[in-house]
Amino acid sequence: MRHQRRVPQLGRPADQRKALLRALTTELIRHGRITTTKARAKAVRAEAERMITLAKDGSLAARRRALGYLYDKQLVHSLFAQAPERYGDRQGGYTRIIRSVRRRGDNAELAVIELV
C-alpha cells in the first residue's frame, strides 16, 4: 500500500515538475554540483541516483532509458563511460546534500547537491 508515500509536489503541475527534475538531473550530472532549494535537492537525488545506477548497468536498454530521460545525448555517453569505474564498488549513495545559507530574496532553504 502507498499510504504516506506522496511525491514531492514542488508547487508545480506534473508536467512542469517532471521537466524541472529532468533539467536539474542533467545539470547535476554535467557539472557535478548544483545549488538549489532543499526540497528540489531531495527530489532530484532519487533521479540522479537512478541514472547512475542505469549507467553502472551499462546495457543497451539502460542506455536507452537514460537517453529518454536526460536532455543531453553526449552527457549520457560520457556518464556510461565514467560511471562503472567511478561508482563500481558503491551500492547507492552517489550524491551528497549539504545545507547552505538561506536565499536572500525569500529566505528559502538552499542546499548544495553534489556527486560523491
Swiss-Prot record:
Q: Which GO terms describe its cellular component?
A: cytosolic large ribosomal subunit
Q: Which domain of life is it from?
A: Bacteria
The record's subunit annotation is: Part of the 50S ribosomal subunit. Contacts protein L32.
Q: Name one GO molecular function term.
A: structural constituent of ribosome
Cross-referenced InterPro entries: Ribosomal_bL17, Ribosomal_bL17_CS, Ribosomal_bL17_sf
Q: Which Pfam families does the annotation name?
A: Ribosomal_L17
Stated family:
Belongs to the bacterial ribosomal protein bL17 family.
Please name the GO terms of the biological process aspect recorded for this protein, alphabetically.
translation
Keyword entries, A-Z: Ribonucleoprotein, Ribosomal protein
Under which name does UniProt file this protein?
Large ribosomal subunit protein bL17
